[in-house]
């Protein structure tokens, strides 16, 4: 065996080890399930010392982060609603998603990005609503400024997104910064991409002042867009996520396929291909798709052919209540009747045997 081959084997060893024992458990995700701040700081498993320190110093911020977990997990489930893996959460698991994120996959990349974005959004919103002692509206947005429409005065309450990003970086990244392996670097990259996504949709809103609606004076402020905007953007980044490998000195990434562009700070990155999520696999954290509702007429990921992995589907007829015969009444209401509707619901069949293998 020549020296170059030996070097290749030596180089691959730490990368393999880093994937076997990844730093995946973002235990702060579990904060939605705990109560008071002191109990939260002392009982969330897996928090590193820096996170516990911030937790004790800023209990009101921790409450905002905990409440925000429900918002970003709901957004994750919305984005994956038509896919085999649907961002299912496990209430009794301290990392919230079970073993599914042990793999350094596209799904892991998205979850780390959307969770980091959710922390920025929750903290920034709490600042603007006066719920936090440590921050308020953006103090830099004062005085007079100009844009394409002319001069305006900063007024109202501009969202203090810089504070939200700063705190989120200190808290969310703390555990990853203690690690030096490939997975920690992947998580840090995707965390940053999530934070940047929220700031990307910061928008200027203005109000006109003057006689008869004229705009002789404008007052403007900066406001975050609805979190769905961030979710939709990160979903596009998920679909265009770039597979990477560690560079030779272990300090960064290079693309796994040289035909693809180098990832930017806005892109999501991953190391490993995703499982197919067709069957229940405890080791992989997959719940499988047996019993999932599928769309018989769709040609997308929610189609019965794709969702059910070629296993077929069962059809049942169900009765549900819907709104019907809606009429507009002056002014200003729409009134509807409740009607019963009979519909066919298609659900994926279970595998025929434990050793069944998906054809897709």
From Swiss-Prot:
Keywords for this entry?
Developmental protein, Disulfide bond, Extracellular matrix, Glycoprotein, Lipoprotein, Secreted, Signal, Wnt signaling pathway
The residues the entry assigns to the signal sequence are 1-26
Q: What is its main location?
A: secreted
Question: How does it get modified post-translation?
Answer: Palmitoleoylation is required for efficient binding to frizzled receptors. Depalmitoleoylation leads to Wnt signaling pathway inhibition.
Q: Which InterPro entries match?
A: Wnt, Wnt2, Wnt_C, Wnt_CS
Glycosylated residues are: 295
A cellular component term (GO) from this record?
Answer: cytoplasm
Keyword flag Lipoprotein: yes
Lipidation residue positions, type O-palmitoleoyl serine: 212
Which GO biological process entries does UniProt record here? atrial cardiac muscle tissue morphogenesis; canonical Wnt signaling pathway; cardiac epithelial to mesenchymal transition; cardiac muscle cell proliferation; cell fate commitment; cell proliferation in midbrain; cell-cell signaling; cellular response to transforming growth factor beta stimulus
Quote the SMART domains the UniProt record gives: WNT1 (SM00097)
- Give disulfide pairs as residue numbers: 76-87, 127-135, 137-157, 206-220, 208-215, 278-309, 294-304, 308-348, 324-339, 326-336, 331-332
Cell compartments where the protein resides = Secreted, Extracellular space, Extracellular matrix; Secreted
Q: Which GO terms describe its molecular function?
A: cytokine activity; frizzled binding
Alphabetized PROSITE patterns for the sequence: WNT1
- What is the purpose of this protein? Ligand for members of the frizzled family of seven transmembrane receptors. Functions in the canonical Wnt signaling pathway that results in activation of transcription factors of the TCF/LEF family. Functions as a upstream regulator of FGF10 expression. Plays an important role in embryonic lung development. May contribute to embryonic brain development by regulating the proliferation of dopaminergic precursors and neurons.
Q: Which PANTHER family match?
A: PROTEIN WNT-2, WNT RELATED
To which protein family does this belong? Answer: Belongs to the Wnt family.
Name this protein carries in UniProt: Protein Wnt-2
Species whose genome carries this gene:
Monodelphis domestica (Gray short-tailed opossum)
């Amino acid at each position: 065996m020549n020296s170059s081959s030996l070097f290749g084997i030596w180089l691959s060893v730490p990368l393999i080890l880093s994937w076997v024992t990844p730093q995946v458990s973002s235990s702060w995700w579990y904060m939605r399930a705990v109560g008071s701040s002191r109990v939260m700081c002392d009982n969330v498993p897996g928090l590193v010392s820096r996170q516990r320190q911030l937790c004790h110093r800023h209990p009101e911020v921790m409450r905002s982060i905990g409440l925000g977990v429900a918002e970003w997990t709901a957004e994750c489930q919305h984005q994956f609603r038509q896919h085999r893996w649907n961002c299912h959460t496990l209430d009794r698991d301290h990392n919230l998603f079970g073993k599914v994120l042990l793999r350094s996959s596209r799904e892991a990349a998205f979850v780390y990005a959307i969770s980091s974005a959710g922390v920025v959004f929750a903290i920034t919103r709490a600042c603007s609503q006066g719920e936090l002692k440590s921050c308020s509206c953006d103090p830099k947005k004062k005085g007079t400024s100009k844009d394409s429409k002319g001069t305006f005065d900063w007024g109202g309450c501009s969202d203090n997104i810089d504070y939200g990003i700063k705190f989120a970086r200190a808290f969310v990244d703390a555990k990853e910064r203690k690690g030096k392996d490939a997975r920690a670097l992947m998580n840090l990259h995707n965390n940053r991409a999530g934070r940047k996504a929220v700031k990307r949709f910061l928008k200027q809103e203005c109000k006109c002042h003057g006689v008869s609606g004229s705009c002789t004076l404008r007052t403007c402020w900066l406001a975050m867009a609805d979190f769905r905007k961030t979710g939709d953007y990160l979903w596009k980044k998920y679909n265009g996520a770039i597979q990477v490998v560690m560079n030779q000195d272990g300090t960064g990434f290079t693309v796994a396929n040289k035909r693809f562009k180098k990832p930017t700070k806005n892109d999501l990155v991953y190391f490993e291909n995703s499982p197919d999520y067709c069957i229940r696999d405890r080791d992989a954290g997959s719940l499988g798709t047996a019993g999932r509702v599928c769309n018989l007429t769709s040609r997308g990921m929610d189609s019965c052919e794709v969702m059910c992995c070629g296993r077929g589907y069962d059809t049942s007829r169900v009765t549900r209540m819907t709104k019907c015969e809606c009429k507009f009444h002056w002014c200003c209401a729409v009134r509807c009747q409740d009607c019963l509707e009979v519909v066919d619901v298609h659900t994926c069949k279970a595998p025929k045997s434990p050793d069944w293998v998906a054809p897709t």
